């Protein structure tokens, strides 16, 4: 059940806060300001610029979805396309529906796979921009990680492919919006709801640890809700893989959510940091959801050395009205010393404040969330669609025509080297090294491999059936058995 505190105050969307925080990466520390604690009379902290922001128009998701379904019905007399199973997935396999978001160097839109009519989110990243911003390595690392993992509380990768301009990732479509969006809409999250998010993230982080992965960017912006209100972790762009006994050392993450040991390692050297940093970030996120601002007043302009000093001198202030159980849980997550911090699923399961949690039910999404996003709305900024249609110099919906023109232009050019040899070399390297991935095909392959071999009676039956059928049906389906080269 939703508590009254978790209902929006009005039908009009609240003014948006400033853009989501930037991230510190191994090559730098470009991060956004934290939310400073407001005066006691203020109901909720706002990012800088709120006073100038205009209310967002509501996007009527239910009406749009109905219109799309009617469009499908009107063209439903035509058969679904059937793609050759031996063919690699590509841009033509998807119908672009609308833009829903953008990141530092990529954009996201809703797509529908033409043959199955399943809906996904598709993130696409311009190759040239990635090269110019030195982001290619991060994209490849994210793909490497996402192709190897799958979990109920992660945003899972289904397909990856490329064309001359862009790299594409097709992932789970979650229509409930991210937690940053709901903070900006002034949603008042109850303790029960925040506790559920903490537990769902605990299951996700426990799985990532089993795969030797540190996410390094857990924050409200990267936690998406599904239509039922369950939390899913996304964006592995600065995640890292560490083997047994190894430690990470790079300054990477979003400053207000980065654990103290990351700054300490950067300033003083030492042994580095490990999986505990993600659990600190969960604590910061939970505190922010409950109070409206973060436990430490950290800005992008803060020197790393000053942050090391801050964590040793400033203590977190907890609201007296919060329950003792919630305060105890937050204290364990926000412990400065990583050795004493909650940093494993076992720690959580043995915590007195979580003794009532049914972890098996939780992992199967049987626990009903306290906050359920409004199903009649698309929980994103509708101006993304306008930007894509009007301001974008290379809009996605005109890609086929643009690529056809480029091919025609390229064929008529002189074969001499272009002036930008370096850029072309980088583009060629991406084209060669990019790994195409198809989880749908991989799952079919695994299902076929797991089927038990037929017994003698079954074998006889199969043979007689095959003899009575047309010859093509007796042939082995090589395309459905053999996954693409990127599926392993």
Swiss-Prot record:
Keyword field: ATP-binding, Kinase, Magnesium, Metal-binding, Nucleotide-binding, Phosphoprotein, Serine/threonine-protein kinase, Transferase
EC number(s) on file: 2.7.11.1
Domain spans labelled Protein kinase: 94-354
Cofactor: Mg(2+)
Active-site residues (renumbered): 217 (proton acceptor)
GO molecular function: ATP binding; metal ion binding; protein serine kinase activity; protein serine/threonine kinase activity
Classification via InterPro entries: Kinase-like_dom_sf (IPR011009), Prot_kinase_dom (IPR000719), Protein_kinase_ATP_BS (IPR017441), Ser/Thr_kinase_AS (IPR008271)
Composition-biased stretches (Basic residues): 397-406
Binding, ATP: 100-108, 123
Region (Disordered): 1-56, 397-420, 443-488
Enzyme class label: transferase
Domain of life: Eukaryota
Positions of modified residues (Phosphoserine): 10, 17-18
Low complexity compositional bias, start-end: 24-33
One Pfam family recorded for the sequence: Pkinase
Catalytic activity, reaction form: L-seryl-[protein] + ATP = O-phospho-L-seryl-[protein] + ADP + H(+); L-threonyl-[protein] + ATP = O-phospho-L-threonyl-[protein] + ADP + H(+)
Entry similarity comment: Belongs to the protein kinase superfamily. Ser/Thr protein kinase family.
Protein name per UniProt: Serine/threonine-protein kinase 32C
